């Protein structure tokens, strides 16, 4: 899991970008 990918996933799930 890449850090950038993890950040993108978290953004999608929490709706906090």
UniProtKB/Swiss-Prot annotation:
Q: In which tissues is it expressed?
A: Expressed by the skin glands.
Question: Where is it predominantly found?
Answer: secreted
User: Where is the protein found, in the record's own terms?
Assistant: Secreted
Q: Which GO terms describe its biological process?
A: defense response to bacterium
Q: Which cysteines are joined by disulfide bonds?
A: 11-17
UniProt keyword annotations, A-Z: Amphibian defense peptide, Antibiotic, Antimicrobial, Disulfide bond, Secreted
Any one GO cellular component localisation term in the record = extracellular region
Annotated family: Belongs to the frog skin active peptide (FSAP) family. Brevinin subfamily.
Function of the protein: Antimicrobial peptide.
Instruction: Name it.
Output: Brevinin-1AVa
Q: Which organism is it from?
A: Rana arvalis
């Amino acid at each position: 899991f890449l850090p950038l990918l993890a950040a993108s996933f978290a953004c999608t799930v929490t709706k906090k970008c």
